[in-house]
């Protein structure tokens, strides 16, 4: 029986406090930034980039002048031809156009200067809004990341019951503990989304919707009331399955040796849950992630998010199992169990990469403007995290976990697991940040504080749940097979 240690409690509470203080500090700091501060910042950036660009562009501009002049002369000739034809067809307007030209020559400079000033003001306001968005987005990314770990584990747990897998029952208590975080974690994600409003979901701004016909066409789905209702339906369904599955699992431990009624109940509700899950997970990914870019959509997106949460969840199962085994609390877990967990980490990492490439390749080569813009933004403004996550989520685990022997080495699995989790945090970061903060991204105090806050909360809830039941589900009819499992 695991006992929640004081050291872990202190560590978790410290993470929560430090994370809360750091995030609140970054939130208040960002909201003290004024439009004047942003204008000064943009002027400094423009001066810095302008000086750097002048030297690099001189030679390029000289080479382009000839072709530019030719094109310009052709344009003037074309304009003159159109103007002369227009004068011939409408001689009565010629004088009027000449008069307008003289008026424009005296006022054109003033109008251009007013338009330029207006554009600068609009850009500064846009940047200010992005900077205000950053604490909200950082909190949302961290909240969603830890929630999706729990949801991924719940799916894996349901699959084990529905498949009547014989190797995994020794890991069920770890899975049940991780899924205990799902209810509070999912409610927090939904609450942040509703509270942040248009700081994360631009379609929650009525003024934007009023001027955007595409979002208006989706308003039957993308509206705040139904967003909240759907979210509560998702969370209720997931939580009910988790509650009854845990209840039947514990009841099976108290049942007579040949009484498997609770196990059969778990089998039935797990099969039903997986049907519910595959639909609601897709709709959740549309609502909670894809709708931050309301003009963009991908039919693969639900599967893509599923792969990310699935491999992240399995990785956390492996890390907690290794920790408890090192403490001498799970001696019934052997190298073959770790080997199978590492196989899933390896296999789902490859599956995630397949989905990433399929989605990217189809959209990129189709080159449809409203679709390809999603990736253009990320390649231009998020080049390092966008391509860096491929190394973290595919290349590194592929190379480290390819060898069968390495899948049995705990520290190898831990090393690969930490990299995989960091990589999938970056994946969620890449999905949320471009639409909310644009090119004003950075992994700093808001992001690190939010991760610390939810990491502390996750550890506290998960290990509290671990302490509430024996680590070995002795009543499971496959427990002997699981204990003797050897690959």
Residue positions per predicted region:
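Juxtamembrane membrane-water interface segments of multi-pass membrane proteins
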Residues: 1-4, 27-29, 156-177, 195-205, ...
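Aromatic-anchored segments of alpha-helical transmembrane domains
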Residues: 20, 279-283, 418-429
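Membrane-interface transmembrane-helix boundary segments in multi-pass integral membrane proteins
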Residues: 299-305, 370-390, 438-462
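Hydrophobic secretory-pathway targeting helix
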Residues: 1, 5-32
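Transmembrane-helix bundle segments that line or gate the permeation/cavity pathway
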Residues: 26-41, 143-254, 273
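Long, contiguous internal "core" modules enriched in hydrophobic/ aromatic residues
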Residues: 20, 73, 89, 98, ...
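Hydrophobic cores of alpha-helical transmembrane segments in multi-pass inner/ER membrane proteins
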Residues: 150-155, 187-188, 231-243, 307-322, ...
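Low-complexity, proline/glycine-enriched hydrophobic segments characteristic of transmembrane helices
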Residues: 24-135
């Amino acid at each position: 029986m695991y006992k929640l240690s004081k050291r872990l409690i202190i560590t978790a509470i410290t993470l929560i406090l430090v994370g809360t203080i750091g995030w609140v500090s970054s939130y208040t700091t960002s909201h003290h930034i004024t439009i004047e501060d942003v204008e000064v910042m943009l002027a400094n950036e423009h001066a810095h980039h302008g000086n750097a660009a002048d030297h690099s562009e001189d030679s390029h501009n000289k080479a382009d002048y000839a072709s530019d002049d030719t094109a310009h002369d052709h344009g003037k000739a074309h304009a003159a031809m159109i103007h002369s034809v227009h004068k011939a067809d409408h001689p009565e307007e010629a004088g009027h156009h000449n008069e307008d030209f003289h008026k424009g020559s005296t006022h054109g400079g003033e109008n251009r200067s007013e338009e330029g000033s207006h554009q600068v003001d609009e850009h500064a306001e846009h940047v200010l809004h992005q900077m205000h968005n950053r604490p909200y987005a950082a909190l949302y990314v961290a909240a969603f990341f830890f929630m999706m770990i729990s949801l991924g584990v719940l799916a894996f747990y349901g699959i084990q019951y529905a498949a009547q897998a014989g190797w995994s029952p020794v890991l069920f208590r770890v899975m049940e503990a991780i899924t205990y975080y799902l209810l509070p974690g999912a409610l927090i994600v939904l609450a942040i989304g509703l509270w942040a409003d248009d700081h994360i979901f631009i379609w929650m701004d009525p003024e934007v919707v009023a001027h955007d016909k595409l979002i208006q066409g989706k308003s039957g789905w993308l509206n705040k009331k139904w967003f909240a209702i759907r979210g509560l339906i998702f969370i209720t369904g997931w939580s009910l399955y988790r509650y009854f599955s845990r209840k039947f699992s514990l009841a099976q431990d108290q049942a007579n040796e040949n009484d498997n009624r609770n196990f059969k109940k778990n089998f039935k509700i797990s099969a039903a849950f997986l049907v519910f899950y595959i639909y609601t997970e897709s709709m959740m990914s549309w609502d909670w992630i894809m709708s931050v870019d309301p003009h963009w959509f991908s039919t693969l997106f639900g599967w893509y998010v599923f792969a990310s949460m699935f491999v992240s969840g399995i990785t956390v199962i492996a890390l907690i199992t290794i920790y408890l085994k090192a403490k001498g609390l799970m001696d019934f877990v052997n190298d073959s169990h770790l080997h199978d967990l590492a196989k899933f980490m390896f296999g789902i990492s490859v599956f995630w990469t397949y989905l990433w490439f399929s989605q990217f390749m189809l959209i990129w080569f189709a080159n449809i403007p409203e679709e390809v813009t999603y990736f253009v933004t990320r390649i231009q403004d998020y080049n390092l995290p966008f391509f860096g996550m491929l190394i973290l989520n595919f290349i590194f685990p592929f190379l480290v976990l390819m060898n069968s022997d390495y899948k049995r080495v705990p520290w190898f699995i831990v090393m690969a697991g930490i990299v995989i989790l960091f990589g999938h945090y970056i994946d969620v970061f890449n999905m949320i940040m471009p639409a909310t903060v644009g090119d004003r991204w950075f992994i700093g105090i808001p992001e690190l504080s939010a991760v610390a806050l939810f990491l502390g909360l996750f550890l506290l809830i998960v290990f509290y749940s671990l302490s509430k039941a024996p680590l070995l589900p002795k009543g499971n009819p496959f427990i002997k097979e699981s204990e003797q499992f050897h690959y």
